[in-house]
Amino acid sequence: MVIPTRDRRGLLLRALRSVLSQRSIELEVLVIDDGSTDDTPDAVRSLHDPRVRVLRHEVPRGVATARNAGAAAATGTWIALLDDDDVWAPDKLVRQVTAAQRASARWAYAGAVEIDGEGRLLGGERPPSPEVLVHQLTRRNLMPAGSSNVVVDAASFRSSGGFDAGLRHLADWDMWLRLARYGHPVCVPEPLVAYRLHTAQATLDTRGMIAEARVLRDRHGADLNSIRRWLAWSHLRRGRRREAVGAYARAVASGDLRSAGRAAVAALHPRPTAARRRPPNPADVEWTESARAWVRAAAED
């Protein structure tokens, strides 16, 4: 499995502990140090775990390149990816690999919950079915927790070409679209990944993402207006009403009249996200709570 990292020693060690605690599966762990200036390499080596190797880039090359470097060095039959600030449940890998093998699927994902900067459980919702996820990929990226979730057959990863290092924002989305050509993934519906939300994630580079969305359109037939609406919704989730209105307005200007009403709601409602917020589904609350024990354990030093 592959973990790219740069200057996040503390978070990385927590992520690594969740990896090294995986049950009933053989592990090869490749930490790709993408030009760290802190003591990340020494901290990883201090674990003295023979399953862990550090590959270092003296100059930062970006997350996509780091992931590809790790995948190229991996010797296993499956490749799993984990961002250095996320954590896994102890049975995450074995359940995904077993499910993929039983279904003869080339890739797999699971449910995910959100945690805060201190590792406290914030919430979550059940993952989409494989059919819904793949059907929506040209419109929205519904993969819970992104790359930290997915396990891919190594041969399929390599034949897909790996992550596009030219895409700074949407390389994950591009990869799922390419993997979908091999068939639907299999889903383990329980929450097995915890995705960390940071204050820094409150901003989005809308211009850069739209530019890359055009690449997805040209490469995969992605619906550009749907992606604009998805970006606007992402702004609303972060409470960035002005940016959401702008994103909807650009969609309207490009001929997407469906966004006109959404722009009005975003502009006029004092708390735009509340306009569509529904009471939590008791089943989803129970589903999320099922992750609390392992999330709490992963947050411990």
Q: What positions do the PLM features span?
A:
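Short, acidic, metal-binding catalytic loop of nucleotide-sugar glycosyltransferases
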Residues: 17-26
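A conserved acidic beta->alpha catalytic loop
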Residues: 18, 33-42, 59, 83
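Conserved nucleotide-sugar donor-binding catalytic segment
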Residues: 124, 129-213
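C-terminal subregions of glycosyltransferases and related glycan-biosynthesis enzymes
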Residues: 197-301
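Conserved donor NDP-sugar-binding/catalytic core segment of glycosyltransferases
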Residues: 91-122
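Acidic helix N-cap motif at the loop->helix transition within catalytic regions
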Residues: 10-13, 36-46, 87, 91
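Short aromatic/hydrophobic "clamp" motif used to bind/position activated sugar donors
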Residues: 79
